[in-house]
Amino acid sequence: MKNNVKNLIEFIDHSPSCFHVIENARKQFLEHGFMELKEKEYWDLEEGKSYFVTRNGSSIIAFHLPKKDFQGFHIVASHSDSPTYRIKEQPEMSVEKHYTKLNIERYGGMIPETWFDRPLSVAGRIIIEENGQIKDQLVNVDRDLMIIPNLAIHMSRSSNESKQLNPQKDLLPLCGGNLTKDGFEEMIAKESGVEKEDILSYDLFLYNRMRGTTLGINEEFVAAPKLDDLECAYSSIEGMLNAKLSKDYVTVCAVFDNEEVGSGTKQGAGSTFFPEVLKRISYLCGKNEEEYYMAVADSFMLSADNAHAVHPNYQDKTDPTNRPYINEGIVLKYNASQKYTTDANSAALVKYLCKKEKIKCQVFFNRSDMLGGSTLGNILTGQVSIKAADIGLPQLSMHSTYETAGCKDLDDMITLMESFYELGKEVQI
């Protein structure tokens, strides 16, 4: 198993919730000398230093300041969340005094059938009271805890036909026998090393316990949960940590929460988090408002979110002339309805970098008779008017609880990120 793929699998394995994604990113940045900033405190920025700031524990913006008289910003944006199920308050539901299942609700647009008949567990954060203080604490029940059992075909002869699943009835996970009321919270408290009475609230989500792996005759594929979009988040972090960062531009690695539900939260791409950080950097470097706008005009962003590869069993679902394949390079994403930010100018820079690094570049369009998904690029450029391109890695089974992508593509994406972060003012965008 190649190093990048091995490290990606480790990153995903240790990131069972969006909060864990950001905590793992935070640890990596700290290990590489980045300094943590707090939004509610004064910032003191020095030339040649690197920093990061988090919001809600589920979004992070890291940046390197080469000099105070910088040209603009070079940004890579991705997201920390994936489709899953959120556990409701008072979740225990007794079934005929013999089973206990949990009350959950959908988060994002998942493929529900992929959650059946596999070991699941729960992770996220709890909010506790400790010595008169309110604190948050990450929790991961690191064992096979529950399952969503299918109905046997003998009891549903039409189960292989199209079926509409009811998330309030058909998708509730079995977590035990006849548990006492509050048994779930008692278990969470025990796993977290706190008293149940100290838990004030929680944000807890289901996750697939299947570990990532490589497969294929030549181990050319990587399969894992949450490849959308942790593959791009991981690549952007690695690219920033590995690159000889630009001496002209502030390089920015941003990972936002809540992309899968529209980004309209205080920590999402549609919030003030992104423009506020860029403005604080600019103003603390002595730029006035006009100079901030000048810096924005000389900036560029890569919105990094995975793309649909041609499916081997459903080839007709892809555009007839623009057909991305796994392990055939970075994907540039276009959409006439402007769900993606790519235009001729921004695509040219991506193609230039791919040519420079000898990386293949592919193109994605939706079929003209099919609606596609959206991502965070156009939401961010609606907040700050930055030239941008939407890119991603080709993958299969997007929004399944277990997805498939290419090993070579991961290497190429990290190389592209490094090259982008190293760009100086010699290349006019």
Task: Label every PLM stretch briefly.
Residues 1-429:
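N-terminal hydrophobic/helix-forming segments and targeting peptides
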